[in-house]
């Protein structure tokens, strides 16, 4: 089927993925053509691509307020979260995990796997009616934890947009001697980080969430946190991630993050204005509509989750929007094949 031109469609699913910025494509193009060397090679082709990767790492670290040695490139957010969670258990001695029931499947399915293998005990922190984490319950669970604990909580929820105060969570973890991993896939590129001042052991990012390429992400590992690789083989990524690097993806990730952070304040104000306008018009037009989460409070400006009154017409809502060239989703893109709601 021939796809429609993007100009003819309205795209409302940027939490799932974003179109590639032409300036990012321009930065990537030389590494798809003449600069094709294997970064592990010692001759000139390899040296120039190695330089590109290390320059990208330095740029990403600077933009996130981290050290270059703390940034590792991965295939995306899922691999990065898997690496952090598995390493917390296998290398850092965590025998207990606290998470929430509304995490991304990259987290939920990983911790459930570890529990199923008998490697950890698992608890879910209470979620308040507005979608926020119950911080008092988290503190109580940390105090009562039966062993060294990993807390894994996302920074911004990919479906309702709620923001979790990762500084507050990190302080609770520090007091309890716990490891803290935060899935920050929705906020890297959309939020100003200073990781040197953030009490977190691991965060994750994915380039395609901020107009970069798919198939490339990052794992931040705080200095002094000693872990082993999830993927074994060669010594790439300073022995932390085997396999020939996604050269053009890494270059694209760094360029996309540079562009995103350069226009962050302007973009955030503009997108928030659109979000609030959309909510206002939906309220005026559709009686009984509800907005899930803390949509107009501690919420990411890029996400709006609306619930429509159940009717025969609403059951066909997404289909009818699609045939009218409006693209939006009824839940996480990673769960779009499931036959149950979010």
Language model feature labels by segment:
Residues 1-342:
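Pyridoxal 5′-phosphate
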